[in-house]
């Protein structure tokens, strides 16, 4: 508990410092700095709120205990406050527990059809809609940066930006970070005339997005920028200028494309943001691998070559192989009902962090 008191004191000091910065009109002359301050402020707010409740309950409990000597009705009030005090202390401990430094970040997500041809692309489309529905229910904004459809309307490859509507302690990364990996589907494809169950797969890549591109060192000499005409379905909305942008990072071979925006300048800026996110993730993976000295990576940075989840259509079952989670509500999950699964994954991650911290 003494450690918690010290941690809260440090957070209170930081919080008051952030309040002073936000009250300074000069801060808003630098939008990037203002975003960083606002984001950190929102991350600390839940801790401050619980701490204030805790202080109030302690004061009320002390008063109730004193009054209980004269009025027995206050004895019952004291018992209620004791229970509330324990609950708040546990809540504060949970908020102060080690957590992923990127949990408040927005993300870049890529969904790619894997083995299985057209069926794999249709499944990738199912995953896309699942994430879109979850995002809608939880107030996240999804923006399509680049996409390629299959002949039957599936998804060959798509790049998304997923962000919070406003700064939050629990941003898009805290929810979607567990989705990186190979997702396997077992079902009868629409292209299968014999009614045989087949197995296909789609890959999902998830990267926390840096607050600013400048946060990641990118040498302009190490990138190649190509421009080309944006694809479209025809009609008046087709962009007939070379506004689409493809950026290749030569040292790593990472290729990023963006064609959503109407201008080449906007597409280049957005592509640079995606490149920064991918390079940041690559740097972290390399650092984690070096620190782990070959140990199996944890949930938050698991090996993307491994199958993480199976979606079994005939049995209406979803299985997450990392934590042994199984549920026979595949239809609900595909409709964006991912809360139970994400809660289980967060609990497993928290347990690993606490074990590593000890």
UniProtKB/Swiss-Prot annotation:
GO cellular component entries: cytoplasm
Superkingdom of origin organism: Bacteria
Coiled coil (UniProt feature): none
PROSITE patterns in the cross-refs: RF_PROK_I
Post-translational modification note: Methylated by PrmC. Methylation increases the termination efficiency of RF1.
Pfam families documented for this protein: PCRF, RF-1
SUPFAM superfamilies, per the entry: Release factor (SSF75620)
One MF annotation (Gene Ontology) recorded for this entry: translation release factor activity, codon specific
Protein family: Belongs to the prokaryotic/mitochondrial release factor family.
Protein name, UniProt field: Peptide chain release factor 1
Protein source organism: Corynebacterium efficiens (strain DSM 44549 / YS-314 / AJ 12310 / JCM 11189 / NBRC 100395)
